[in-house]
Structure formats: structure tokens, C-alpha cells
């Protein structure tokens, strides 16, 4: 039997030859560098009719095919266990920009936030500001914290003494410098550039807690505020800031049959530089995604539904736990993703014991009638691009958080056991490779966000740990 060094050299040469003949030049360069394979050996194998000295250099694929044929029965059984998704539905990868997960992507710990935050505190919300310079955090004990990433300092204040409730939602008003605060009493508060409450800038939008909120820029000084609450209403409001004065006008509302589970907004360009908006909402015990259009900049109109089950007689087969709008072809620098043929929705389901992800096509027809009866709303049953199982464990109480990191080419899912990466091309899912000092991120994820510049992510757990992770692209 040949010694290990000879067999290793020959194996490396087989692999290098395979990479070269299949045009995988970048992978070949990395392989040669990491194995220290002499380039001259590869060149000699080409110039000597696939011989290395007197040793014939076989084709790697032929070697593998022969091996499979020799042990075809055991290989057939073994292949069944390699993936939980043997036959994924075909999808136009080029159209939707779907690529394999970027395995060169790495993460490093920036700082453990606990050291500069109130001790023994569970944070229920963590959001980057629009300029990615600050992190806005809300705790279960009533604290609001503004963390300065560059200075590694934090400022906190007991907001519940002023708003008389724990803050559930906390985030930026686009790039205006203003922030919003939504405590659990259904109110909407404004904070100024110094993160202080603005006088006379509080509005009761919902009778009960606001569960979901989206802010969409209309003009330089006005924004749509789209909210859903525990009172089962979807509401559209207009926030205006003029000469230091703030106004919020309630425009439209729709009563929902059950509580909202996700809320997304997509901008529809009209070709004249103006945007209209489509609101995509899911709710409990309803396996459809409902689309509402904002008509005449003031009215919410139910435009269509997208069914996630094929049974037209049933609208409930599982719960939709989270939805995220993505576009892997066009980079998005605005606060609202734009509609294009490559835009799609990623849906996390309630299937047990393992979550499923569904990729959904969005209809391109944006010309909706101004009035439409509910029984005439069109339902699409042919918009599912891919429906696949994951290895993400969950139970009846799981609340997954979906996130998109552009350089990853895939989807991040914060769940009961940590943060998972999901490869949309292969359906592969696995716990994210996070440095050892952040082991607590393998607990239940309570909050997670990715900075606008895509350079950092923040995640907090049920064990009261919270971390900033640096995103290292094209790591070698």
C-alpha cells in the first residue's frame, strides 16, 4: 500500500485536475494555496496525457462512478440520509438571485453588550439606527438604552416612568434622526435626535398593544405609519414633521379576523419617481398572505391573497410565524424594499417539530381597483416557488425571527436553539458558526437585527445575554 504522503498527493492532484477541467478557477486557486500543491505537477499532468511520471492520472468523476457502482446498494441507502429535502422544486435561480450559502462568511465578537448595559436585564427589542451608528434597546424592566457602537458607551433611562408601560417596539423614523417608541398600551411616542421624548408627540393608535409596525417614507418630512395591534386592527396613519411641530393623522383601518403574525411593506414604483405601497399581512389560523394596497395615499384596500396551501376549500392548515420580503438581485438602500420580478417573500411556518420555509412569488400587477368587495378579492394558488423542510426545531411557543444578510446569499433564523443559517439553493440549515465566547447565543433568541450597512448584527437571548457580531466577508 502506498504511504500516506503519496496517496495524499495523488488525491490532491485528482481534485485539482477536476476543478481545472470544470472551470472552477477560484476554487482551484484556493485549493492549490491551502494544500501547497505544486502548480508544476498540475501542468505536467496536462502535458503528459494525464500521466504523472509513470502513474496514470485518472478522472476523479470516473473514480467516484466506479466506486458507486461497486457499492451501489449501500450508497443508495446512504444518500437517503444526506438531506431532508431530496427533491427540491425547480426554481429560476438566475431570476431570483438564489446562490449557495457563502461558506467563506465568518463572524467575530465585537463586544459583549452586557458589560455596559443595566445588569441582569432581559432585552426584548434591539434595532440599529438608519446610519448603523447606534443600537436602540428596550428591556423587560422598562429601560430604554441607546448604545454608541463607535464609542462603546451606552445611555439608558427609565422610560416606563414617563410612558407608564414597558416598551415593546423601538426604532428609527427612516433617516430623519427621530425615533419611535411603542409601549404596551397601544400608544405611539416620538423621540428627538437626542433620544428625548418630544413634547405633545404621543398618539393612541390602538386600544391594545401594537404588535407590528412599519415606517415608509412619503416625502422628506412625512411618513406612513402602518401598524397592527392586539385589538385586531390594521391601521394606516400619516406622520408629519413641519417646522419642529409633529402631526399624526389616522387615515384608514381594517378589522382583522385574528391577530397579525407578520407585517411587510413593499414599494411599487409608478415610473414617475413616485411610490405607492403594498402591505403584506399574515394572521393566526389563516394560511393566506393578504395584500392591501394604499390607494390615493389614504385608503387601505384589500387587493389579493396568496394561498400557501393548495386546498381551495380550506384557509387554515398551519400558522405563519414570520415573513420577510427579500430581493437577492437588486441591492436595497432605502427603508422599504422595492417591487421587481426578483422580489419574493420568505415564510417561516409553524410545522412541528421542525420548521418549514416557503419561498413565495409576488404578483407584479399593481393596478388595483379603488373599491373591491371581499368576496371578489382574487386568491392566487400558484405563487409558491419552493417549500422545504429545515432542521430548525420548534414547538407551540416558538417565535422565529427572520433576517437577511446580503453577503450570505441565504436567510438567518433566530429561534429556540440559537441562530440558524439556511441555504435557499440546497435547503440546508444549520446552527450558525459563532465564536466560542458567544456560546449563550445558542439559547432562545429574543431579539435580532442586522445593520443597514450589513457589517454587524445584534442578537439577545432569553438568558439575558446580548452580543454584537462583526460580519467578516470573503474570509480566507
From Swiss-Prot:
GO biological process: regulation of biosynthetic process
Record-linked SMART domains: LisH (SM00667)
Domain LisH: 7-39
Domain of life, per lineage: Eukaryota
Any single Gene Ontology cellular-component annotation: cytoplasm
Transmembrane residue ranges: none
Any further remark recorded for this protein: Present with 1280 molecules/cell in log phase SD medium.
Protein name, per record: Uncharacterized protein YGR117C
Organism of this sequence: Saccharomyces cerevisiae (strain ATCC 204508 / S288c)
Amino acid at each position: 500500500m502506498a504511504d500516506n504522503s503519496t496517496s495524499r498527493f495523488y488525491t490532491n492532484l485528482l481534485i485539482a485536475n477536476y476543478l481545472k477541467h470544470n472551470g472552477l478557477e477560484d476554487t482551484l486557486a484556493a485549493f492549490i494555496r491551502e494544500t501547497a500543491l505544486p502548480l508544476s505537477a498540475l501542468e505536467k499532468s496536462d502535458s503528459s496525457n494525464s500521466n504523472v511520471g509513470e502513474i496514470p492520472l485518472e478522472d476523479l468523476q470516473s473514480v467516484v462512478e466506479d466506486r458507486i457502482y461497486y457499492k451501489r446498494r449501500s450508497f443508495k441507502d446512504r444518500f437517503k440520509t444526506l438531506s431532508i429535502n431530496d427533491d427540491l422544486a425547480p426554481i429560476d435561480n438566475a431570476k431570483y438571485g438564489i446562490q449557495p450559502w457563502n461558506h467563506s462568511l465568518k463572524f467575530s465578537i465585537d463586544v459583549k453588550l452586557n458589560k455596559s448595559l443595566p445588569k441582569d436585564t432581559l432585552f426584548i427589542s434591539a434595532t440599529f439606527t438608519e446610519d448603523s451608528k447606534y443600537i436602540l434597546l428596550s428591556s423587560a424592566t422598562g429601560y430604554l438604552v441607546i448604545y454608541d457602537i463607535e464609542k462603546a458607551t451606552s445611555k439608558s433611562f427609565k422610560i416606563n416612568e414617563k410612558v407608564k408601560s414597558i416598551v415593546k417596539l423601538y426604532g428609527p423614523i427612516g433617516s430623519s434622526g427621530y425615533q419611535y417608541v411603542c409601549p404596551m398600551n397601544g400608544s405611539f411616542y416620538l423621540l428627538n435626535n437626542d433620544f428625548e421624548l418630544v413634547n405633545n408627540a404621543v398618539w393612541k393608535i390602538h386600544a391594545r398593544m401594537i404588535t407590528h409596525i412599519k415606517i415608509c417614507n412619503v416625502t422628506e418630512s412625512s411618513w406612513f405609519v402602518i401598524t397592527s395591534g392586539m385589538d385586531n386592527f390594521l391601521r394606516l396613519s400619516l406622520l408629519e414633521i413641519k417646522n419642529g411641530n409633529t402631526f399624526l393623522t389616522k387615515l384608514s383601518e381594517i378589522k382583522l379576523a385574528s391577530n397579525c403574525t407578520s407585517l411587510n411593506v413593499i414599494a411599487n414604483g409608478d415610473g414617475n419617481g413616485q411610490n405607492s405601497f403594498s402591505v403584506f399581512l399574515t394572521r393566526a389560523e389563516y394560511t393566506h398572505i393578504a395584500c392591501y394596497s394604499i390607494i390615493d395615499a389614504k385608503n387601505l384596500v384589500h387587493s389579493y391573497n396568496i394561498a400557501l396551501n393548495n386546498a381551495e376549500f380550506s384557509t387554515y392548515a398551519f400558522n405563519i410565524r414570520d415573513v420577510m420580503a427579500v430581493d437577492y438581485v437588486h441591492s436595497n438602500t432605502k427603508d422599504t424594499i422595492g417591487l421587481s420580478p426578483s422580489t419574493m417573500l420568505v415564510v417561516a411556518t409553524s410545522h412541528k417539530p421542525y420548521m418549514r420555509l416557503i419561498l413565495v412569488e409576488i404578483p407584479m400587477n399593481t393596478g388595483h381597483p379603488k373599491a373591491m368587495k371581499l368576496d371578489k378579492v382574487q386568491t392566487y394558488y400558484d405563487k409558491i416557488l419552493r417549500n422545504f423542510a429545515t432542521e430548525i426545531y420548534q414547538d407551540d411557543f416558538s417565535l422565529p425571527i427572520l433576517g437577511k444578510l446580503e453577503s450570505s446569499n441565504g436567510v438567518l433564523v433566530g429561534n429556540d436553539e440559537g441562530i440558524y443559517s439556511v441555504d435557499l439553493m440546497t435547503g440546508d440549515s444549520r446552527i450558525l458558526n459563532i465564536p466560542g465566547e458567544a456560546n449563550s447565543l445558542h439559547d432562545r433568541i429574543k431579539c435580532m437585527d442586522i445593520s443597514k450597512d450589513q457589517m454587524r448584527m445584534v442578537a439577545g437571548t432569553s438568558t439575558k445575554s446580548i452580543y454584537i457580531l462583526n460580519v467578516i466577508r470573503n474570509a480566507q
